[in-house]
Amino acid sequence: MIKVYGMPSCPDCAEVAKKIKAIGRESEFEIINIGEHVAYLKAFLQLRDREEAFRPVREGGYVGIPCFVREDGTVTLDPAEFGL
């Protein structure tokens, strides 16, 4: 299952969640709302701090959501890689 870190208040995250539902692929994705619980936020921040995919995000002062973590642990910020 692909993990999607995001927040409903983020327009890009909301659009990704909407597309996942619209194309009936909910069983392929676990959407994790980082604003729902501090444990989710901590997990995302640890990922954001260590993954190379976030370097431009960190340098630009951005949050980096939505973020996708594949089953093999690789990270991308590009929803198009999943047809979204």
Set out the residue ranges of the language-model regions:
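Non-catalytic, surface beta->alpha helical segment in thiol-disulfide oxidoreductase systems
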Residues: V63-L84
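Local sequence-structure signature of Cys/Sec-based thiol-disulfide redox active-site neighborhoods
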Residues: M1-N33
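Short, internal strand/loop/helix patches
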Residues: R50-G61
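Short C-terminal domain-edge/linker segments immediately following a structured domain
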Residues: I34-E36, G60-G64
